[in-house]
Swiss-Prot record:
Organism taxonomic ancestry: Eukaryota, Fungi, Dikarya, Ascomycota, Saccharomycotina
Species whose genome carries this gene: Scheffersomyces stipitis (strain ATCC 58785 / CBS 6054 / NBRC 10063 / NRRL Y-11545)
Enzyme class: ligase
Pathway(s) this gene product operates in, as recorded in its UniProt entry: Purine metabolism; AMP biosynthesis via de novo pathway; AMP from IMP: step 1/2
Family matches, as InterPro entries: Adenylosuccin_syn_GTP-bd, Adenylosuccin_syn_Lys_AS, Adenylosuccinate_synth_dom1, Adenylosuccinate_synth_dom2, Adenylosuccinate_synth_dom3, Adenylosuccinate_synthetase, P-loop_NTPase
Residues the record lists as binding IMP: D12, E13, G14, K15, N37, A38, G39, H40, T130, R144, N226, T241, R305
Name of the molecule in the record: Adenylosuccinate synthetase
Length: 430
């Protein structure tokens, strides 16, 4: 059976830390979608490991790790990330596998990503992408003109010529749209000829890989990237990523049936953050937002961009819960709220004086909503040294209980600091 870790807000919730905790007891960790536009930081002892494309389970020496079919892979970044982990002492090369069906991100995808974003900026409609080429790669995938891993590593005598043909076709179509690129596309092609041999040992048939693990009753953890509110279908479109970031993306990105899913863990930051453009109803453009940003050290792992900050939005989380069906929650960074005398929580939206029954799909409406807040008392106590859930201040427990009652989902873990062991587990009834 598979357990799944998913982001429930706009990303940066701290999914990697829960994955790291759960990886102590699993056999396989799999990424199902996204690319190196995601970012996790995991702290083991005094060492920080940054993950963008590769599964966080690599920190566990007994865990096999799969980059699934739904992931889009920039090969130079794949090897750079692997080398960075190895430099920090992780011996993980023989535990990393890549789906033969995953699509490849090329440098021209990244160039077109930035060029398109620049065009949109002129009309003040920029998405705020990471510029990693993720969107353009999913676009070529959807138009059936993309290049997959198996096209690169195939040992068929005609495979390399076919790869070159596909590559030039993609490059030329982008040149027609954007003009000449500011780099040598033939040099990139030559690099990929070398990558053929380097990448081949990692490549597997991920369908066979996953179903063999399931038949053998291996304990499998699926690591979602980004978060539900960035989902291509259910997020705040068009200010979203280009993949399915919810539970549906797990099934399509790994090729597994729904009946194999056991627990679905929703990771929730104790307040709300967002990187890039797009609506953010509970955003605080004031001293509260600045305090959350400063205390929480809210900078993106992938881009280094300052994150926008605001109060917890339970309307967003209810919507997220309806789609993903969380079985329990991990509330992260609760300690960031330690110094607040009062804490506000968004519990409803009003538009033109009328309460909305659901999260609006129309961004014009969403931009005009008035958030209804519930004010809860803070605990004004340092919780970073606390080791058990029972030791939490009563007001902190009340804050967590309020979230549970609103969503109808139990809180199972509470993050109280950046360290690997700064996570309290709360017993829940199944």
């Amino acid at each position: 059976m598979c357990d799944v870790v998913l982001g429930s807000q706009w990303g940066d919730e701290g999914k990697g830390k829960l994955v790291d905790l759960l990886c102590d007891d699993i056999d396989v960790c799999a990424r199902c979608q996204g690319g190196n536009n995601a970012g996790h930081t995991i702290v083991v002892g005094d060492v920080k490991y940054d993950f963008h494309m590769l599964p966080s389970g690599l920190v566990n020496p007994n865990c096999l790790n799969l980059v699934g079919s739904g992931v889009v892979v920039h090969v130079p970044s794949f090897f750079q990330e692997l080398e960075n982990l190895e430099k920090k002492g992780l011996n993980c090369r023989d535990r990393l596998f890549l789906s033969s069906r995953a699509h490849l991100v090329f440098d021209f995808h990244q160039r077109t990503d930035k060029l398109k974003e620049a065009e949109l900026s002129e009309n003040k409609k920029a998405i705020g992408t990471t510029g990693k080429g993720i969107g353009p790669t999913y676009s070529t995938k959807a138009s059936r003109s993309g290049i997959r891993v198996h096209h690169l590593v195939s040992e068929d005598p005609e495979a390399w010529e076919e790869f070159k043909t596909r590559y030039h076709r993609l490059v030329n179509s982008r040149k027609q749209r954007y003009g000449e690129f500011d780099y040598d596309v033939e040099e990139e092609l030559a690099r990929y000829e070398k990558y053929r041999e380097l990448l081949r040992p990692f490549v597997v048939d991920s369908i066979e890989f996953m179903h063999t693990a399931l038949v053998q009753n291996k304990r499998i953890l699926v690591e979602g990237a980004n978060a539900l509110m960035l989902d291509i279908d259910f997020g705040t479109y068009p200010y979203v990523t280009s993949s399915s970031t919810g539970i549906g993306g797990v099934l399509t990105g790994l090729g597994i049936p729904p009946k194999t899913i056991n627990n679905i863990y929703g990771v929730v930051k104790a307040y709300t953050t967002r990187v890039g453009e797009g609506p953010f109803p509970t955003e605080q453009l004031n001293e509260f937002g600045e305090a959350l940003q400063t205390i929480g050290a809210e900078y993106g792992v992938t881009t280094g961009r300052k994150r926008r900050c605001g109060w917890l939005d339970l309307v967003v989380l209810k919507y997220s819960t309806l789609i993903n069906g969380y079985t329990s929650l991990n509330i992260t960074k609760l300690d960031v709220l330690d110094s607040f005398k009062e804490i506000q929580v968004g519990v409803g939206y009003k538009l033109n004086g009328k309460s909305l029954a659901s999260f609006p799909e129309d961004l014009i409406k969403l931009g005009k909503v008035e958030v209804e807040y519930k004010t809860l008392p803070g605990w004004e106590t340092d919780i970073t040294k606390i080791k058990t859930y029972d030791e939490l201040p009563e007001n902190a427990k009340s804050y967590l209980k309020f979230i549970e009652d609103y969503l109808g989902v139990p809180v199972q873990w509470v993050g109280t600091g950046p360290a690997r062991d700064s996570m309290l587990e709360k017993p829940i009834s199944k």
